[in-house]
């Protein structure tokens, strides 16, 4: 399920269709129910573990790790454009897309670069959310980071802050690692 969810959002965006809205509309209620189930486990006084019925894939999973800095996790591309692009146009676009990207809004990059209908940028754009989702899933499954409780933050909460708010310092560190990885993937 993580792979399908992670693939569909950027795949739809590649064609100019708002993937987060389409996929979120279909799976959002399930992810929110999973978040509430995790909160119920905590409210009952039990430890939030898989053995106690904890759910790994929640709304926080999607918002803070699959769609962080926007669909396709484009902050790596933005950083590359700002510091390493040879074209003045790309540098300027990176600067313009940087602040919105920190609030998980990346349409300036999607349409300005363009990533939409660009097969060369489609590969990292589609791959990065899958990589992020798999790293997070296995990190939670083996206990490197805690499961998501019921804490929900708005999807526009900046990265690292959002990781800390929904999962503590370990989640913020993992989110930082994944964001750094996005630079190398792009």
Task: Spell out what each predicted region is.
Residues 39-59, 76-78, 96-99, 110-186:
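Transmembrane alpha-helical segments and their short flanking loops
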Residues 84-91, 114-120:
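Juxtamembrane helix-boundary/capping and inter-helix hinge elements in multi-pass membrane proteins
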Residues 1-84:
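Generic multipass alpha-helical transmembrane bundles of integral membrane proteins
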Residues 8, 93-96:
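A residue-level detector for conformationally permissive "hinge/kink" positions
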């Amino acid at each position: 399920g993580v792979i399908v969810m992670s693939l569909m959002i950027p795949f739809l965006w590649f064609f100019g269709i708002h993937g987060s809205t389409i996929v979120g509309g279909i799976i959002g209620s399930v992810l929110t129910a999973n978040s509430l189930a995790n909160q119920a486990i905590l409210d009952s006084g039990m430890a939030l573990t898989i053995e106690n019925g904890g759910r790994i894939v929640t709304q926080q999973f999607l918002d803070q790790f699959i769609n962080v800095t926007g669909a396709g996790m484009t902050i790596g591309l933005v950083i590359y454009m700002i510091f390493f692009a040879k074209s003045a146009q790309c540098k300027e676009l990176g600067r313009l897309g940087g602040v919105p990207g920190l609030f998980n809004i990346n349409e300036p990059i999607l349409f300005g670069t363009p990533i939409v209908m660009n097969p060369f940028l489609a590969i990292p754009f589609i791959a990065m959310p899958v990589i992020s989702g798999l790293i997070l899933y296995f990190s939670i499954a083996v206990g490197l980071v805690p499961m998501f409780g019921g804490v929900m933050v708005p999807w526009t909460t900046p990265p690292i802050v959002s990781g800390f708010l929904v999962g503590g310092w370990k989640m913020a560190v993992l989110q930082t690692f994944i964001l750094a990885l996005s630079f190398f993937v792009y």
